[in-house]
Curated annotation (Swiss-Prot):
Glycans are attached at N211. The lineage of its organism: Eukaryota, Metazoa, Chordata, Craniata, Vertebrata. This is CMP-N-acetylneuraminate-beta-galactosamide-alpha-2,3-sialyltransferase 2. It catalyses: a beta-D-galactosyl-(1->3)-N-acetyl-alpha-D-galactosaminyl derivative + CMP-N-acetyl-beta-neuraminate = an N-acetyl-alpha-neuraminyl-(2->3)-beta-D-galactosyl-(1->3)-N-acetyl-alpha-D-galactosaminyl derivative + CMP + H(+); a ganglioside GM1 + CMP-N-acetyl-beta-neuraminate = a ganglioside GD1a + CMP + H(+); a ganglioside GM1 (d18:1(4E)) + CMP-N-acetyl-beta-neuraminate = a ganglioside GD1a (d18:1(4E)) + CMP + H(+); ganglioside GM1 (d18:1(4E)/18:0) + CMP-N-acetyl-beta-neuraminate = ganglioside GD1a (18:1(4E)/18:0) + CMP + H(+). Residues 1-6 are cytoplasmic. GO terms for cellular component: extracellular region; Golgi cisterna membrane; Golgi membrane; membrane. It is found in: Golgi apparatus, Golgi stack membrane; Secreted. Keywords: Disulfide bond, Glycoprotein, Glycosyltransferase, Golgi apparatus, Lipid metabolism, Membrane, Secreted, Signal-anchor, Transferase, Transmembrane, Transmembrane helix. The chain crosses the membrane at residues 7-27. A beta-galactoside alpha2-3 sialyltransferase primarily involved in terminal sialylation of ganglio and globo series glycolipids. Catalyzes the transfer of sialic acid (N-acetyl-neuraminic acid; Neu5Ac) from the nucleotide sugar donor CMP-Neu5Ac onto acceptor Galbeta-(1->3)-GalNAc-terminated glycoconjugates through an alpha2-3 linkage. Sialylates GM1/GM1a, GA1/asialo-GM1 and GD1b gangliosides to form GD1a, GM1b and GT1b, respectively. It is a single-pass type II membrane protein. It comes from the Eukaryota.
Length: 350
């Protein structure tokens, strides 16, 4: 009898331990899966959101299913928003000239060599090989993170920026691209103070801070020789005009604009209007190929129809539209088309 009672008590105790274990496990699991834990009972002030461990994977799956290439509301390079844009855009062509795409197609080589006079014959590949011993010669935009939204401001030099008050908005972008002279000191309220990329050719080049990428737009082989010289020996002082013999820029941030990309813009986008696209067009399409969102400032005439730079008053400023080198009217049309296709946002200024 005593043995039976002992067995009965042990069985009941075992059952109670088992039930308590189940209750503890269930309560712990339930708390872990609650979307919020109100910690007011602890300190009376905070409400803490608890995120399940699988939440990141779930979000990733939804993003992949959405088909978007970035985390922006609209991703510039994604197809489907505009048939016109999709028929022109080629996301496979790199805007940067590197070791990997050093060999130009024959038609590109011929076209590029005719842009400006070549006073002496040079082997382009040999020149590039030597240049890429000084600068990286790599494409820093090869890999894109679909979980990020790379917002870019393309800042032109139009007088319509004066009094615009765009400075703070411009500075809020990830990439801020400027071209040629583009001073910021004294104009910060309208054009911003930050720059991440500055596009120049030898005749417009200036020294840059260490955190800015210098993007050389080459029109001839001599331009490649010049940048190599300006970052080393300083021997070249003249092209078709005086140039800086030495250039203070971060060598690790020097990039070379790809002539094949240059011709792609001329063929597909500006459609041979003008001899070749303007620097503004080159920068804009560079941004369209490396950014997820592109906002454009300082392009076109001001509200009075004047074409001039924001840092100067020039009564002859509209004369460049008549040179035949660039077709400003057609380029303005392309910008309008890109805006209508929701690929860029244009800020017209004053």
């Amino acid at each position: 009898m005593k043995c039976s009672l002992r067995v009965w008590f042990l069985s009941v105790a075992f059952l109670l331990v088992f039930i308590m274990s189940l209750l503890f496990t269930y309560s712990h699991h339930s708390m872990a899966t609650l979307p919020y834990l109100d910690s007011g009972a602890l300190d009376g002030t905070h409400r803490v959101k608890l995120v399940p461990g699988y939440a990141g994977l779930q979000r990733l799956s939804k993003e992949r299913l959405s088909g978007k290439s970035c985390a922006c509301r609209r991703c510039m390079g994604d197809a489907g928003a505009s048939d016109w844009f999709d028929s022109h855009f080629d996301g496979n062509i790199s805007p940067v000239w590197t070791r990997e795409n050093m060999d130009l197609p024959p038609d590109v080589q011929r076209w590029w060599m005719m842009l400006q006079p070549q006073f002496k014959s040079h082997n382009t590949n040999e020149v590039l090989e030597k240049l890429f011993q000084i600068v990286p010669g790599e494409n820093p935009y090869r890999f894109r993170d679909p979980h990020q939204c790379r917002r870019c401001a393309v800042v032109g030099n139009s007088g319509n920026l004066r009094g615009s008050g765009y400075g703070q908005d411009v500075d809020g972008h990830n990439f801020i691209m400027r071209m040629n002279q583009a001073p910021t000191v004294g104009f910060e309220q309208d054009v911003g103070s930050r720059t991440t990329h500055h596009f120049m050719y030898p005749e417009s080049a200036k020294n840059l801070p260490a955190n800015v990428s210098f993007v050389l737009v080459p029109f001839k082989v001599l331009d490649l020789l010049w940048i190599a010289s300006a970052l080393s020996t300083g021997q070249i002082r003249f092209t078709y005009a005086p140039v800086k013999s030495f250039l203070r820029v971060d060598k690790e941030k020097v990039q070379i604009y790809n002539p094949a990309f240059f011709k792609y813009i001329h063929d597909r986008w500006t459609e041979h209007h003008g001899r070749y696209p303007s620097t503004g067009m080159l920068v804009l399409f560079f941004a369209l190929h490396v950014c997820d969102e592109v906002n454009v400032y300082g392009f076109g005439a001001d509200s009075r129809g004047n074409w001039h730079h924001y840092w100067e008053n020039n009564r002859y400023a509209g004369e460049f539209r008549k040179t035949g080198v660039h077709d400003a009217d057609f380029e303005a049309h392309i910008i309008d088309m890109l805006a209508k296709a929701s690929k860029i946002e244009v800020y017209r200024g004053n």
